[in-house]
Amino acid sequence: MKPYKIENIRNFSIIAHIDHGKSTIADRLLESTSTIEQREMREQLLDSMDLERERGITIKAHPVTMTYEYEGETYELNLIDTPGHVDFSYEVSRSLAACEGALLIVDAAQGVQAQSLANVYLALERDLEIIPVLNKIDLPAAQPEAIKKQIEEFIGLDTSNAIACSAKTGQGIPEILESIIRLVPPPKPSQETELKALIFDSHYDPYVGIMVYVRVISGEIKKGDRITFMSTKGSSFEVLGIGAFLPEATLIEGSLRAGQVGYFIANLKKVKDVKIGDTVTTVKHPAKEPLEGFKEIKPVVFAGIYPIDSSDFDTLKDALGRLQLNDSALTIEQESSHSLGFGFRCGFLGLLHLEIIFERISREFDLDIIATAPSVIYKVVLKNGKTLFIDNPTAYPDPALIEHMEEPWVHVNIITPQEYLSNIMSLCMDKRGICLKTDMLDQHRLVLSYELPLNEIVSDFNDKLKSVTKGYGSFDYRLGDYKPGAIIKLEILINDETVDAFSCLVHRDKAESKGRSICEKLVDVIPPQLFKIPIQAAINKKIIARETIRALAKNVTAKCYGGDITRKRKLWEKQKKGKKRMKEFGKVSIPNTAFVEVLKME
C-alpha cells in the first residue's frame, strides 16, 4: 500500500443493469491501472463464481483497490462492486454508503433500464457524485445523444461530463479514471478519533474464518485491537490481521485508516455474527453512536427443499450449511412432509436468490432436489386479537378462527417500448395490479408504476413480462405495506387423501383456475392403477375442481370360452368387489416426476 493521504483516496461504485457491461468495464480499469498483470487477466475477473460468468450477473459484491498516477500524484481508487439485481438492494445500499461516487453505466444502444434506475435512486439518496458512462459506443445501434437526453430528462443528471466508452475496445477508459479523480470527492476527514467502520460485506474462508469487509469512517483499525459490533453489543473479538484487495485479499502491515477500504480477520466462525450495515468499533475507545441505515436482512420468499432420494438428506443439510457460510440472508429450518419426507424450509431475498441457491446445490454438490412452490409471508389476524405470520400452507390456522388475512404488496417500475403497453396492462390486471402512473422515458419507451401483490411477482411475473414484451421489458420492485386480501388454503386430494406437498395459499379469485390446472396436470403425470383415482382441489373441505384417472382395464373373462353368461357375470361381480376394496385400502404411489412437474408449473 502507498503512503496514506486521505485527499488522494477515491471510493466509488458501479451501477448498471444486467448485461450493460459493468464487469467488463471493471476488467478494463484493472488493466489500465496495472492492478493485475496481462497474463493473469481473464474476463469478468471480479465475478468469482462460474454461475456469475455464465449468467453475466454479479451475485456477490467484490471490492478491489487500484493505484493510479495522475498529474504527479498517486491516487488510491477503491472500487466497491455491487450486485445489480433488485433482490440484493440492501447490499447495494450498504455498498453505496461506503462510497462518495458512482459510475452509472448505460448501454448506448438500449438506454436506461429498470434495475439501473432503482440503484441510481439509492445513490442519489446518499448524495453521491454520479458520473454517467455510455458503454458499447462502438455498436452500430448506439445513440449517445438520445441516451444522454434520456438520462437528463428522466433521472435529472447533468450529462455534460458523460463519458462515451467501449469496454470491448478500451476506448474511454483513461477518461473514466481521470473523471473519478477529478469529480468524485475524497472522504471527509472526521473530527472523531474513535474507530467507526461500516461493514459492507463478509466472506467465509475455510482457513481464517470470516473476513469482514469494511470502509473505515473514522479512527483506525490494526492488528491486536479488540473490537465489537455495535448492533449485537456484548461479544468482542481480537483483530488477528488486516488486509486490502490487491485485487485478491492480501494481508498487510500497519493499519486501515479513515477513508480506506479493506478487511480484517478476528477468528469469527459464523457469518450470522457479522451483519451487513453494522458498525465496528473498539472496546477500549468505543464510538458514541453507530452509523445510520443498519437493518436486519429478512427473507421475503420461502420454499421447501427436499432431496429426491431420501438418503441424500445429510448431504443436503451439509450443502445448505456451506452455502449459508457466505450468505447471511439465507435462512434454513428443518421440516418434514408426509409426501416428500424430510427437508428444509428456506428463506430467500427474492426469486433470483432462490434460483441461484437451487442451481448451486445441484451444481456444486451434485444433488437432485425437489422445491415446493415459492411463498411469501402472510399476516393472519385471528378473532381473539392475536396476529400470526405464516409462509407455509401447513401453518394455516382453522378458517373459523380467522378474522382477516393480509398479504405483502410491492411498488413496481416497468420500463417497456410503447407498443407493448396494452400487453403489460393486461398482465398487471391479471396479477391484481393497481396502476399508479405512466411516464414517457423517451420517444419510444414508457415507465409504468404499479402496485402488485408480492405473491404474484414471485411466481412467473418476470417470465410473462419478457414474453409479452418480446424480451424488451424490464422491471424492479421494492417492498411496500401489507394490505387485506382474500387469501385461502387450496388443498389437493388424491384418492380422497390430502397431499400436503401440493397445498398452497392463493387468492380466492384464482383458487378455482389454479386447482383445476393442478388436477389436470396430475392426471397426465400419475400412472393409472387397477382402480379409479379421483383427483380433487378443495377449499375448506369444499371440492372446487375434479379430474379422474381411469382404471386400467383387466379382462377377467378372457379364460371363458362361450358358454353360460352367468359365469361371466360372477367374475365381473367379483372384480367389482375387488376394485371397491382396492379403492378403500389401496395406496396411490405418486412418482417423483409428478411432484417435479406440478411444482415446476406452480
Curated annotation (Swiss-Prot):
Highest taxon in the source lineage: Bacteria
Segments passing through the bilayer: none
Pfam families in alphabetical order: EFG_C, GTP_EFTU, GTP_EFTU_D2, LepA_C
Gene Ontology, cellular component aspect: plasma membrane
Cell compartment(s), UniProt: Cell inner membrane
Topological relation to the membrane, as annotated: Peripheral membrane protein
Reaction(s) this enzyme catalyzes, per UniProt: GTP + H2O = GDP + phosphate + H(+)
GO molecular function: GTP binding; GTPase activity; ribosome binding; translation elongation factor activity
Chief place of localization: membrane
InterPro entries noted in UniProt: EF-4 (IPR006297), EFG_III/V (IPR035647), EFG_V-like (IPR000640), EFTu-like_2 (IPR004161), LepA_C_sf (IPR038363), LepA_CTD (IPR013842), LepA_IV (IPR035654), P-loop_NTPase (IPR027417)
EC number per UniProt: 3.6.5.n1
Gene3D superfamilies: 3.30.70.240, Elongation factor 4, C-terminal domain, Elongation Factor G (Translational Gtpase), domain 3, P-loop containing nucleotide triphosphate hydrolases, Translation factors
Residues that bind GTP: 19-24, 135-138
GO biological process, one term: positive regulation of translation
Keyword set, alphabetical order: Cell inner membrane, Cell membrane, GTP-binding, Hydrolase, Membrane, Nucleotide-binding, Protein biosynthesis
Residue ranges of domain tr-type G in the record: 7-188
Physiological role: Required for accurate and efficient protein synthesis under certain stress conditions. May act as a fidelity factor of the translation reaction, by catalyzing a one-codon backward translocation of tRNAs on improperly translocated ribosomes. Back-translocation proceeds from a post-translocation (POST) complex to a pre-translocation (PRE) complex, thus giving elongation factor G a second chance to translocate the tRNAs correctly. Binds to ribosomes in a GTP-dependent manner.
Family to which this protein belongs: Belongs to the TRAFAC class translation factor GTPase superfamily. Classic translation factor GTPase family. LepA subfamily.
Protein name, UniProt field: Elongation factor 4
Origin species: Chlamydia muridarum (strain MoPn / Nigg)
